[in-house]
Swiss-Prot record:
Molecular-function GO terms, alphabetical: ATP binding; cyclic 2,3-diphosphoglycerate synthetase activity; ligase activity
Localization in the cell: Cytoplasm
GO biological process, one term: gluconeogenesis
Stated name of the protein: Cyclic 2,3-diphosphoglycerate synthetase
Temperature optimum or stability note: Optimum temperature is 75-80 degrees Celsius.
Enzyme Commission number: 6.5.1.9
Subunit relationships: Homodimer.
Keywords: ATP-binding, Cytoplasm, Ligase, Nucleotide-binding
Species per Swiss-Prot/TrEMBL record: Methanothermus fervidus (strain ATCC 43054 / DSM 2088 / JCM 10308 / V24 S)
Key word Ligase present: yes
Gene: cpgS
Function description: Catalyzes the formation of cyclic 2,3-diphosphoglycerate (cDPG) by formation of an intramolecular phosphoanhydride bond at the expense of ATP. It is also able to catalyze the hydrolysis of cDPG but with significant slower rates (8-10 times). May be involved in thermoadaptation.
Ligase is among the record's keywords: yes
């Protein structure tokens, strides 16, 4: 059966003590299981032994109680997992002591400590983390898709590069290459024609590593992944190989970039997490939203403006993040477009993945900040049929295509624009802090980088 696994059992007062005792003995009798401790997590209906010492003596195991029998002692569970270096936490409780929300919170705590969380018909295992990087590193991950994680990653890469840390980005995406692909954004000129040429070769030239290379002008390594688990693992990915390649590149710092809510299975020193204020609150404060938030050294909240999120909701998100992860720096932001080329005086057709409700703000910003005339806009960059419809509607009014480098930006938007004789300029999205009281986002990013470098040096 292999090595013996150390197990902590969670029990409640809704079961009679003899039933609990027999169940723990059944587990403890298994050759590969050693029940090292028990945590009482609540319930009083059938609780016959209230004294922790007596409970421990009768059970023959150390038993830990929280201060309030009506509340699950999450901190006690966490401390016990750490104290006993537990491999498995077995949940022998049931409703009404626990419900789905409470179990997900227990799972988030247990899994972050590297233990398995298991019950009668479920089993959650910790994230896969290959310890392969030979350079200081951070992860940039998100709590969902289309919340601006890649924009944050590209921006962070520029900030890190500007401060002379010589970074490279290892990005994984659903359209990434079969073998990890190096893009020397620091050396080659990435033009619309170049990207279209790559697309004609079968490359997904709007993949995240191309966006990072274009926007940040640094080395990137593109990888692929398929499937995303509840916790963040992927079904299959070649990003471990991508990380190993990054070890050999001419860079001194590695940024591992997630994909949607999926997390690269590579161990890093520190982590930045993006949370979309526009996401349903249940996806932030329930399921494994708290797990991802709990990983962060810096949380960047994106989409912090009406109509995507009310001021009240933004405050609610911020408050929850600080409750889950009080040590993390939290910065609320909005995105604003930044063309990487000159658009002044041009009649612009603007293609974006931004939600339709905020497009008007982006258009006004582009026109006032960069002196262009936006004659048409499509928010359907990730919907090819609707994108083609919008391009057909506006293409004859424009002399320049301004597009984010995402989804169908190359194989549809760029191709249609070039065929129509339009210039093509790509557009970055810059996170802007909503209030200076939150501090400087560049400083916050560099603080995480320096913590990562210190960790790397101290653990060599």
């Amino acid at each position: 059966m292999g090595e013996t696994k150390k197990m902590i059992c969670l029990v409640d007062g809704e079961h009679y003590f003899p039933v609990v005792k027999d169940s723990i003995e059944i587990l403890d009798d298994l050759e590969h299981i050693d029940v090292v401790a028990v945590v009482f997590i609540g319930g009083t209906e059938k609780l016959q032994i209230e004294d922790p010492k007596e409970y421990s003596e009768k059970l023959g195991k150390p038993v830990f109680f929280g201060p309030d029998p009506k509340k699950i002692p999450y901190d006690v569970i966490k401390k016990c997992v750490k104290k006993y270096n537990a491999d498995i936490v077995m949940d022998l409780s049931d409703e009404p002591v626990v419900d789905y929300t409470k179990r997900f919170r227990i799972a988030s705590i247990v899994l972050k400590e590297g233990a398995v969380y298991q019950g009668a018909d479920f089993k959650f295992e910790p994230l896969t983390e290959y310890d392969v990087l030979e350079k200081p590193s951070i992860k940039i991950i998100g709590t969902g898709k289309r919340i601006g994680k890649t924009a944050v990653s590209a921006y962070a890469a520029r900030v890190i590069h500007k401060h002379k840390y010589n970074p490279c980005v290892v990005a994984m995406g659903r359209g990434g290459p079969r073998e990890p692909e190096i893009v020397e954004g620091n050396k080659i000129e990435i033009t619309a024609e170049y990207l279209l040429e790559q697309a004609d070769k079968g490359v997904h030239a709007a993949s995240d590593h191309w966006e990072d290379a274009l926007m940040s002008r640094i080395l990137t390594v593109g990888c692929r992944r398929c499937g995303g688990g509840m916790l963040g693992d992927t079904f299959i990915t070649n990003v471990k190989r991508g990380a190993e390649i990054a070890n050999k590149l001419d860079s001194d710092f590695v940024i591992m970039e997630g994909s949607g809510a999926a997390i690269p299975p590579v161990k890093t020193n520190r982590q930045i997490v993006t949370v979309g204020a526009n996401q349903p609150m249940i996806n932030i404060n329930n399921f494994f939203g708290p797990f991802r938030i709990g990983l962060a050294d810096l949380v960047i909240i994106t989409m912090c403006e009406e109509p995507m999120a009310t001021t009240e909701k933004i405050k609610k998100v911020e408050k929850f993040i600080k409750e889950i992860n009080p040590s993390a720096n939290v910065i609320p932001t909005v995105f604003r477009p930044k063309p990487v080329g000159n658009v002044e005086g041009k009649k612009v057709l603007f293609a974006t993945t931004a939600p339709k409700v905020v497009v008007g703000k982006l258009v006004n910003y582009l026109e006032s900040k960069y002196g262009c005339d936006v004659v048409g806009v499509t928010p359907h960059l990730s919907n090819r049929p609707l994108l083609r419809r919008d391009l057909k509607k506006y293409i004859n009014k424009a002399d320049l295509m301004l597009t984010e480098l995402k989804a169908a930006a190359v194989d549809v938007a760029t191709r249609v624009a070039i065929e129509a004789g339009l210039d093509v300029v790509y557009c970055d999205n810059i996170p802007v802090v909503i209030d200076e009281s939150y501090g400087n986002i560049d400083d916050a990013i560099i603080e995480v980088v320096e913590m990562a470098i210190d960790d790397f040096k101290n653990n060599r």
